[in-house]
A protein has these predicted regions:
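Short helix-boundary/capping micro-motifs
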Residues: 38-48
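Residue cluster at the C-terminal edge of the helix-turn-helix DNA-binding motif
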Residues: 67-72
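Central "turn" residue of the DNA-binding helix-turn-helix
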Residues: 52-54
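Basic, amphipathic "hinge/linker" alpha-helix immediately C-terminal to the N-terminal HTH DNA-binding motif
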Residues: 76-101
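Residues within the DNA-recognition helix of helix-turn-helix
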Residues: 61
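Short, Lys/Arg-enriched N-terminal segment that forms or immediately precedes the first helix
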Residues: 9-23
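Helix-turn-helix/homeodomain-like alpha-helical modules used for DNA recognition
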Residues: 94-123
Length: 123
């Protein structure tokens, strides 16, 4: 592929994406953001709405992520007159904290290579 062909692609800023793997599951920024939002709003459906996804999709992502852990990341309470909801367990909170800490370390360690990549990236 020559340089002319490459200019047809959307050029993005060089970066690093962090994905963690546990059992058969992948955990990345989107799932961690969903967990964090769930903690803030206390509802899977409200978190899903704020992220622009269906309740079903959000529930699938949360359940698939949770399936890799020996303990729950969140617990739910059925709705109705007492108003249901969801909240993170200590493990869910710990996952968010550890993921964010890991990402910060990776970002700090990546500044030199990302600067180099920006300098050699096709313009």
């Amino acid at each position: 592929m020559n340089a002319k062909t490459k200019t047809n692609y959307m050029l993005k800023e060089p970066g690093v994406r962090t994905k963690l793997f546990i059992a058969d599951e992948t955990i990345g920024l989107g799932k961690v953001n969903l967990l964090e939002l769930l903690s803030e709003v206390g509802s899977i459906s409200a978190a899903a709405r704020q992220m622009g996804m269906s309740y079903r999709r959000a529930r699938f992502l949360l359940d698939s992520m949770q399936s890799g852990f020996c303990e729950p990341l969140f617990v739910t309470k059925r709705g109705g007159s007492n108003r249901g909801g969801a909240k993170l367990t200590p493990l869910g909170k710990d996952l968010i904290r550890r993921y964010r800490s890991h990402v910060n370390l990776v970002d700090k360690q990546s500044t030199e290579i990302l600067a180099w990549m920006r300098s050699v990236q096709i313009k």
